[in-house]
Amino acid sequence: MTGDKGPQRLSGSSYGSISSPTSPTSPGPQQAPPRETYLSEKIPIPDTKPGTFSLRKLWAFTGPGFLMSIAFLDPGNIESDLQAGAVAGFKLLWVLLWATVLGLLCQRLAARLGVVTGKDLGEVCHLYYPKVPRTVLWLTIELAIVGSDMQEVIGTAIAFNLLSAGRIPLWGGVLITIVDTFFFLFLDNYGLRKLEAFFGLLITIMALTFGYEYVVARPEQGALLRGLFLPSCPGCGHPELLQAVGIVGAIIMPHNIYLHSALVKSREIDRARRADIREANMYFLIEATIALSVSFIINLFVMAVFGQAFYQKTNQAAFNICANSSLHDYAKIFPMNNATVAVDIYQGGVILGCLFGPAALYIWAIGLLAAGQSSTMTGTYAGQFVMEGFLRLRWSRFARVLLTRSCAILPTVLVAVFRDLRDLSGLNDLLNVLQSLLLPFAVLPILTFTSMPTLMQEFANGLLNKVVTSSIMVLVCAINLYFVVSYLPSLPHPAYFGLAALLAAAYLGLSTYLVWTCCLAHGATFLAHSSHHHFLYGLLEEDQKGETSG
């Protein structure tokens, strides 16, 4: 770890906390220049009267939370929203609300870790976890990033197809995403604030486009408010339950926790002053709350629109609506039967156009395009931070995005060429499940490290935080178990059960290890092993020196 000063000793112990020039307990001189990322620009924080709230200071801290909130608005979330609306109407709006609150709590921990330690979650994982579990953990997060990027590619390809009235085939839209990704790489050359402003513009486009759909759909406000504030689901069965757990899995993204812990490092914070750290934590929490409130409203727009337009609609009804509209050529995408319509982000845009005119279709596609493009860039940042943090490996932006986008495009373009649109949308649903399955590999580490007094000092999680975040972890594990139990019977061949068993064993092995180290961080001394005492007492001084020399 570059520039580390020897750790402060705990009473009678040979262990100490991470201590660097940016640590709250070690304001000593810097030994070597810090490791930089391509977001190395630091935004200065204006001086204001101590103990008072300042809009100027809030504005200076504004940015990381809105970049983080984009993961709550990616094409995977949009598809989850519209499917929940089509399947359950307004009955699952309260699930969306509380999933967003749970997401805010996780992001709060991520921001706090970055502010207090001056290091992102990937860097802290590199310091504390041994090589083998650290490498496996890194691979799982990379898998989550590639999965998220695939969703962005799918959403963008469908948006181009809708905007071109089908002239750009799906595989063509997938290939276009290669070009537009590298175009966005040049944006950060114009400064961090301009980059953050551009992301703000994309969020505004989503708010306006999906807000327009909400206005023209005119959902019933009384039913909407009941669905939002009454935690119940009358008459619901297995499909509604599956959508409910899908909402939680789509909202809380594993790579986003790693991303947020790194983005907060872009602000100049004097970590030698506890008051400045406390103030930064407060302003970042306010900003994240505002950003996720905006993302919640946008998600609500989508779920409410499709709860109004699609709920309990049959394929025959959708066919008739389109056949009698100016978009009658699209009617053929709906089978002529009385089965409940299975909606996706493509069919969603079509039915909006059939119901409310072609403008609604094109505006939907623009919003979908904004969702895909904004998520593309945040995924690139997350990949860069994760690779640098876990591996101490610096790649150029071009090389990093080429790796991620290649891994995302190859399977996506194969599905787009050799299968149909329904398979592409089905792949999107499967990727939402993947994100949920990988979520413990972000939540467990952030809960572990933010609960360590040796690392976080007075900013470690209190009892209430530990109870709430542990409850989130239990909820996530229950959701994953439900997904697995629901999915296993659909495996096409008995041979797949063997592969599933191997993957499950590896998954449980890593999860068990992370739970064990989390228990150590919470003070379970009876579980301690000599090679893992640092989860209880902090890092050995020679460990930190080794990082410095490395």
UniProtKB/Swiss-Prot annotation:
GO terms for cellular component: endosome membrane; ficolin-1-rich granule membrane; late endosome; late endosome membrane; lysosomal membrane; lysosome; phagocytic vesicle membrane; plasma membrane. Coiled coil: none annotated. Induction: In response to lymphokine or bacterial products. Macrophage-specific antiporter that fluxes metal ions in either direction against a proton gradient. Localized to late endosomal lysosomal membranes, delivers bivalent cations from the cytosol into these acidic compartments where they may directly affect antimicrobial activity. Involved in iron metabolism and host natural resistance to infection with intracellular parasites. It catalyses: Zn(2+)(in) + H(+)(out) = Zn(2+)(out) + H(+)(in); Fe(2+)(in) + H(+)(out) = Fe(2+)(out) + H(+)(in); Mn(2+)(in) + H(+)(out) = Mn(2+)(out) + H(+)(in). Belongs to the NRAMP family. GO terms for molecular function: cadmium ion transmembrane transporter activity; iron ion transmembrane transporter activity; manganese ion transmembrane transporter activity; metal cation:proton antiporter activity; protein homodimerization activity; transition metal ion transmembrane transporter activity. InterPro entries: NRAMP_fam. Residues 1-45 are annotated as: Disordered. The keyword Transmembrane helix applies. This is Natural resistance-associated macrophage protein 1. It holds the Pfam family Nramp.
